[in-house]
Amino acid sequence: MKIRPIGDRILIKFKEREEVTKSGIVLPDTVKEKPQIAEVIEVGPGGIVDGEKVEMVVKKGDKVIVSKYAGTEIKIDGEEYTIIRQDDVLAIIED
């Protein structure tokens, strides 16, 4: 199944959450922090703000840092993804 975001929305997949701390403590789901680094899977065509077209800055394959509580979580074919708006992207990670 392919998801194609609309407007200024972006489909991302978060980096896996840490299951065990560096000291070996296993973390239950209730105390794990939501990761903020994600990979861009798909990008919408852009949106309209104040009557003007907004170009998308991020592109498919980018690694990004996103706001901690941004987006809508979805599950597709057993995989977890999040749909966010471009404004929720704080930075693009460049290697």
Swiss-Prot record:
This is Co-chaperonin GroES. Keywords: Chaperone, Cytoplasm. The gene is groES. Belongs to the GroES chaperonin family. GO terms for biological process: chaperone cofactor-dependent protein refolding. Gene3D superfamilies: GroES chaperonin. It comes from Caldicellulosiruptor saccharolyticus (strain ATCC 43494 / DSM 8903 / Tp8T 6331). One of its GO terms (molecular function) is unfolded protein binding. PROSITE patterns: CHAPERONINS_CPN10. NCBIfam families: PRK00364.2-2, PRK00364.2-4. Heptamer of 7 subunits arranged in a ring. Interacts with the chaperonin GroEL. SUPFAM superfamilies: GroES-like. Its main location: cytoplasm. It is found in: Cytoplasm. Together with the chaperonin GroEL, plays an essential role in assisting protein folding. The GroEL-GroES system forms a nano-cage that allows encapsulation of the non-native substrate proteins and provides a physical environment optimized to promote and accelerate protein folding. GroES binds to the apical surface of the GroEL ring, thereby capping the opening of the GroEL channel.
